[in-house]
């Protein structure tokens, strides 16, 4: 039996029954996991494959790729100061380390690699609060957030250091990066992503309706549930804060199209792709960030059990969304487990798949 046939057999005879048992134990308001695995000679899907879902931070790579494509087109440099790229953006209210002038020292590359020194308004430092924090955002479920408003919530929060000095994951980085791309191109942030990423990658069902749709259109959106800290927020306008960092509504198939265009197509040249993917900082054991793309190192999660597994590159979302590509195996793994409470389970599931993908090495 060929390796691809053996892997397909495992998916159907081992993983599918496991997922079915998982579904049988889930609460009624939590749908079955959405899962799609695509590799040469292999295709496995589970759950509502065609149903729309929100990427959460698994959409951050969209912003990074859009920025890199604009750099490739000669419209900007990732190493240029923000004040040079977008002089009309006022950074004076943002927290800074002593002696730092953000307009001169902060670059787009710092933002994309989470090394700006800006705090995260979605999860502010202990003792601080913002209107868009996860604990408070649902007090105004109908509020529409744009990237500039998310960035503005940093005012009053403490600086986390000088640009380039240290890593601190946060949505303000990508919200400000989108503001810069908007200034550089003269387009709305949604149009930047559509023209630089979604359209060239063939992502025909991807967009940001929580920011762009009418109330009637949003209410009728056939989207998978999004559970955050016990609240279901999939149709709330407040989820537009999740678009400020590149988050979008998409499908499993569209995410595979994005990864195919990025890693195996001509969406971006190889040097820029390597720049985005190269791990530079560790968020926590097993999860490392580059300049827009994350890398999972399963061996750091359970060294004795998962050592030697391949290291996929992609994006991870708050409610257990995984969108990853395995370069050596040419495999795509995209999943959505719908809830912040399912993150640990999502990694267990992904690790099981990664162990089997070694058959394609």
Q: Which residues make up each language-model segment?
A:
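Short, surface-exposed loop or secondary-structure junction motifs
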Residues: 29-33, 93-313
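Active-site SXXK
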Residues: 54-82, 177-182, 255, 330
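Short, glycine/proline-biased beta-turn/loop segments that scaffold the active-site neighborhood
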Residues: 77-96
